[in-house]
């Protein structure tokens, strides 16, 4: 079985708490060098680099899967900064659209220091 790093961040992951200054193309080049066939992008609370990542992956002939690292809280309407991290990787275009909506709601309605996801919304997602 091939190893693929599905949890990583790039230079656009989080403006407030940057994890890295590595750019998408550097990751993709290295993935190709290692013989990987898939590149995952999972930035903090956003899908900020999805178009750049897809373009670069196409250039290098590697599959691109988009995900997010989300912040789960029991009730995002409460002003409590505690949260649990979760990686969400949709496997279909339909699922990707649903994750985008989930993430939009987290940013619009659940934002308190970070875009927080409603547990109910997460549980309502299809298994795809």
PLM features: residue spans?
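Phosphodiester-processing cores and adjacent nucleic acid-binding clamps
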Residues: 1-128
């Amino acid at each position: 079985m091939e190893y693929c790093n599905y949890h990583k961040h790039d230079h656009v992951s989080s403006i407030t708490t940057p994890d890295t200054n590595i750019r998408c193309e550097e990751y993709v080049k290295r993935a190709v060098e290692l013989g990987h066939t898939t590149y995952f992008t999972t930035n903090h609370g956003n899908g900020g680099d999805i178009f750049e990542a897809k373009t670069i992956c196409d250039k290098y002939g590697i599959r691109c899967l988009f995900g997010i690292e989300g912040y789960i809280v029991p009730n995002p309407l409460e002003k409590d900064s505690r949260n649990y991290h979760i990686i969400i990787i949709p496997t279909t275009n339909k699922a990707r659209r649903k994750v985008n909506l989930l993430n939009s709601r987290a940013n619009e309605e659940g934002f308190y220091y970070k875009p927080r996801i409603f547990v109910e919304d997460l549980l309502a997602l299809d298994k795809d």
